[in-house]
Amino acid sequence: MENPIDSLLLQPIYLSVLSFFLNLVLLLILFGSWLFKKRVACEDTDAIMNEEFKHISFSYNKLVLICCVSLSVFYSVLSLLSCLHWHTNGWPFLDLLLAALTWGSISVYLFGRYTNSCEQKVLFLLRVWWVFFFVVSCYHLVVDFVLYKKQEMVSVHFVISDLVGVCAGLFLCCSCLWKKGEGERIDLLKEPLLSSAESSDNEEVTAPFSKAGILSRMSFSWMSPLITLGNEKIIDIKDVPQLDRSDTTESLFWIFRSKLEWDDGERRITTFKLIKALFLSVWRDIVLSALLAFVYTVSCYVAPYLMDNFVQYLNGNRQYKNQGYVLVTTFFVAKLVECQTQRQWFFRGQKAGLGMRSVLVSMIYEKGLTLPCHSKQGHTSGEIINLMAVDADRISAFSWFMHDPWILVLQVSLALWILYKSLGLGSIAAFPATILVMLANYPFAKLEEKFQSSLMKSKDNRMKKTSEVLLNMKILKLQGWEMKFLSKILELRHIEAGWLKKFVYNSSAINSVLWAAPSFISATAFGACLLLKIPLESGKILAALATFRILQGPIYKLPETISMIVQTKVSLNRIASFLCLDDLQQDVVGRLPSGSSEMAVEISNGTFSWDDSSPIPTLRDMNFKVSQGMNVAICGTVGSGKSSLLSSILGEVPKISGNLKVCGRKAYIAQSPWIQSGKVEENILFGKPMEREWYDRVLEACSLNKDLEILPFHDQTVIGERGINLSGGQKQRIQIARALYQDADIYLFDDPFSAVDAHTGSHLFKEVLLGLLRHKTVIYVTHQVEFLPEADLILVMKDGKITQAGKYHEILDSGTDFMELVGAHTEALATIDSCETGYASEKSTTDKENEVLHHKEKQENGSDNKPSGQLVQEEEREKGKVGFTVYKKYMALAYGGAVIPLILVVQVLFQLLSIGSNYWMTWVTPVSKDVEPPVSGFTLILVYVLLAVASSFCILIRALLVAMTGFKMATELFTQMHLRIFRASMSFFDATPMGRILNRASTDQSVADLRLPGQFAYVAIAAINILGIIGVIVQVAWQVLIVFIPVVAACAWYRQYYISAARELARLAGISRSPVVHHFSETLSGITTIRSFDQEPRFRGDIMRLSDCYSRLKFHSTGAMEWLCFRLELLSTFAFASSLVILVSAPEGVINPSLAGLAITYALNLNTLQATLIWTLCDLENKMISVERMLQYTNIPSEPPLVIETTRPEKSWPSRGEITICNLQVRYGPHLPMVLHGLTCTFPGGLKTGIVGRTGCGKSTLIQTLFRIVEPAAGEIRIDGINILSIGLHDLRSRLSIIPQDPTMFEGTIRSNLDPLEEYTDDQIWEALDNCQLGDEVRKKELKLDSPVSENGQNWSVGQRQLVCLGRVLLKRSKLLVLDEATASIDTATDNLIQETLRHHFADCTVITIAHRISSVIDSDMVLLLDQGLIKEHDSPARLLEDRSSLFSKLVAEYTTSSESKSKRS
């Protein structure tokens, strides 16, 4: 018995009544609004309205207006035809008449609208009405189809009316959600009042997407100019339009942050709250894409629903004239809707994903800016960069899949409904079969989450170590340790690869189950029909098969969806966990505005500790006051807490107790210089505008003018990463210049003078501290006692406490700590006095002679010549298409490519079995009940099941082969790339920002690990699938080739037209990622400096700008892809419709209805499959750019061999340690100027040689050449008669020892830092620690030699790090030792002890010392003085000091005069 409610709902008359009353209500509201406006109208309303309408944007308001007018005209015509031609009356006629009146009223209302507050409510109501209209029209259309299926008469004009209503309603609903360029919702009913000038300005900055009309957006024609440009030239980054302002990172970030903080009063960020804030920041795109996904899903099932009717029509069961063409039209319209909604869905989803990535990158960066140092020790730079480079990208990629879970539920529901209509009760078995498939995947999904989490942790560990190694590559090469650390990274990769292997094989299992699912579900349903004795007819079978084929897509995609859900969940958890870390305490420092207090710095009962859990605080009992304008010096032994005190004033050290107040703006000069990659000028300005006069004064005070003249591009020279092309002294003085230029109130100097020579140090102290900063508050840490007498207050520190405080003469006799420091300094001066003849020159004379000397050598060296190039070059970018060689090399990585043909064979076999099973079901089932089936039901199901099992087995084999091959290729690519990176020369690292390398090691490697194998497999699967479909269709009606051949040609042409622009957009997007990673890494390393200058907003703006650069390239790359896919799907849809027309036009009986139905079943997916194949091919090429970039690094020129077997030196080499240099010429690159100019000298074996000279004169370059870090351009160096160029690098570097200028420690333990090669016993290590004055410090630690060392040794002071480096050489005991500013960061007393240790342990060794402290080289046997890359003097110190005109004598005089004069003034 029929349900009465269903009967009621299906009566057209009741639908007409409902529609009539909805129209009537809206008319009454519009009439009431009109009356209200008449009462409150102003005199100038008409003028405003007319002016407003004059500037209405055609792309929005007029299209909506035209749509409403068209509907009014349409319903008017339809009502007249109903009355005059069809003789319809009653409610249907009244409904059409009132609809015409309603849409006419809306049109008049829109044309004459006003902009008052009351109006907004009416505008909102119109939007609601449009949604209702769309829903009611859809319901009308459904009723039409149901009535049609019941073979009841349906009026044609009703069907036409409902179709027009659905299309117009969809357009009006979509228009409600479109946005405008200024970041606000487009009000389709209201435009802002803009003058012509303002409109013009707005058009100049608005992106093409925001200016595009509705038709342009629907067809993606707004991308056509850029794609056309890509065919005319190679697209550069300046050719790509900007993002719309509402889509910029800044706009989205502040929305995201406000939602996150508003929802999180406790500052506790959970994964759910993070998801919620992400959704609210891009909700419009997500909601619109969800609506489009819903319409797409419904439209996909129109064809299966009508499949039985189509087969019956071909079989001769025709219900009315032209039924075939009506069916073809319905199929065609459904496919058009499917095409349009899918493309817009994907585009909007990816747009939302880009927005989420932007806000996450900015939020992670923002967190990095507020992260205290103790939190950073738990999360290294590599881990944080991984969050930004991998996890944020993964969440962005999830936008492809975010609607899939609920869409799958909808699709399964629709499929079960259609199956029920086709198979009756037998379809019920499909439901438990589907549930069983889902349950079978549950354990695999849980394993996937576990494997993914472990995979990301292991990736973090690898990236952490990679980042640390790249940062310290120079010291690794100097020590000959690079291959040892490479093996550590390969071990970490091996652990990662273990989890990766489990992950990909688990994914293969999921893949196999779900790919076999459609066959399993269909076999279950058909078997149930057999058991229930439900007759199987070909029409119903084909409807079921068509449903299963549509269901195949989401089911096949389900493994990837599950994988992405798991990966995204892990990434969200990791980011949420990171964002939950404690921020830097804001209440550590009480900040007062400039000039509000006489006290600049005041600490009362202060206790500070880097580690809250430590029983012994870092600083305790801190009590002192610093008045405005005071000079305060801080001194003490290594590790006494000097740098920590400055960090406490900056607010970097957590406060345990006490009060700290700071009045005014701060500037900070770190002990280890932090220099940004960029121009020298940019480093000095540091965000402030150029003031030329002040800028020149700063350069003069910092003694930088001479250095800038030497640099190839003066202050426009681009500094390499970490200032690699500058000397230590130059970096320090640029850092000082940066602080001076800020014109702050309080200056904090952390021992900046130790990195420069005595003359430069004295000049800086006089011109900076006593000159430009004479009226400023200055607090400086120093180990140089000669700079103490000028201080208004001296703080002497020991073990984290201030032991003495006062002026120089007040504390000189009041305690032993200060006396020890001064005594050591006096002893050093006495050593110098015993060597020199007492000559001391006047400084003015020295300066004058230096100027003459500089001018003369500038002429000799040709430094006025034009420079030939910058050290840091733009990132390499391939041009044109990705070459076949890249594909060939990539595929050959796994077993020489032998597995690839096997995968193709398995896939072809699977395709044949799949088509065969469906062909079998179609062939043996009768067209109608009247025809006797040729085989029994048991045979029918048995053969189908056997074919399905065989095809499932092929799926399993294919999945395993793809996983195995992809894993092998990714692993080999990783190994080859890293091997070449570690074997690259230092010139590569000098010219390549670390971010570029990390980008390849993280993002590009992730693509190779997880994305590329699946992409390759899908291309093969889709291509073979398409060939199979075309084969099936051609077998039925070969005439379709007439249509397919030109369509395929057109598709190929479109692909070729598109790929030029798309390829370059993808490359530019890949390149634009590196600056983001590099900026991130650079910021984390200099975070203390950035915070001290209050530069967080500027750096936040920089990361947003860099993120926007990537987003706009990715956005337009996505737009280009959808531009192509839309056109391909449109062509395929026309081809599909043409095929249907051929089938229905054929004479009855010519075409087998069952086979024709099978052909249509396969053809239903042809448009999507063909477009997806082309899209995947293009995306594969874009993804192959990652492989291309990694392969670039497998072709990096390597250093000379590590070992040359034929010329290996004896184990005792070098036995004497004699170094002979002949005509040595050195430059840092072929395009860079010469640094050393023809040096010739000899370092006698067993003697100690000191190398001195002004900052930047070439001292460190000479040492780098000795270790072959830089290869000579000409000349040679011989050690004990062996040319160092003739032996392997490892044999050379492992026989030499060096304490480098920049002390380096690696994450690990004290033991692993002293003995990374594990060659020495604990007793030997303890002996080395005692000799380098660190033994007692390490014994205090609970874990002794296993005490932890954090990333870059951040939990040890710079001086202690330098002592650890000294401990390494004491263990190694090489015959030749180089000290490159080895004691620059330690106090004089410790320096004297170390010098004594070196004299004792290296008495018979050749020792080369570079030092700015004259006391460190004065007792050398020989002194070599360099100036601008030339040897000026080379003799014993005594002989040089005898010659009062020698440059060395003048250097010593400057040092002693400066020190003694300051001591006397005290």
UniProtKB/Swiss-Prot annotation:
ABC transporter domain boundaries: 601-824, 1219-1453
One annotated GO molecular function: ATP binding
Catalytic activity: ATP + H2O + xenobioticSide 1 = ADP + phosphate + xenobioticSide 2
Binding site for ATP 2: G1253, R1254, T1255, G1256, C1257, G1258, K1259, S1260
Binding annotation for ATP 1: G636, T637, V638, G639, S640, G641, K642, S643
Keywords: ATP-binding, Membrane, Nucleotide-binding, Repeat, Translocase, Transmembrane, Transmembrane helix, Transport
Transmembrane segments: 16-36, 63-83, 91-111, 128-148, 158-178, 286-306, 322-339, 400-420, 425-445, 512-532, 890-910, 937-957, 1026-1046
Upregulating conditions: By salicylic acid (SA).
Localization per record: Membrane
A Gene Ontology term for the protein's cellular component: membrane
Enzyme class: translocase
Membrane topology: Multi-pass membrane protein
Basic and acidic residues composition bias: residue spans: 844-863
SMART domains noted in UniProt: AAA
Family: Belongs to the ABC transporter superfamily. ABCC family. Conjugate transporter (TC 3.A.1.208) subfamily.
Entry protein name: ABC transporter C family member 6
Organism: Arabidopsis thaliana (Mouse-ear cress)
Lineage: Eukaryota, Viridiplantae, Streptophyta, Embryophyta, Tracheophyta
Gene from which the chain derives: ABCC6
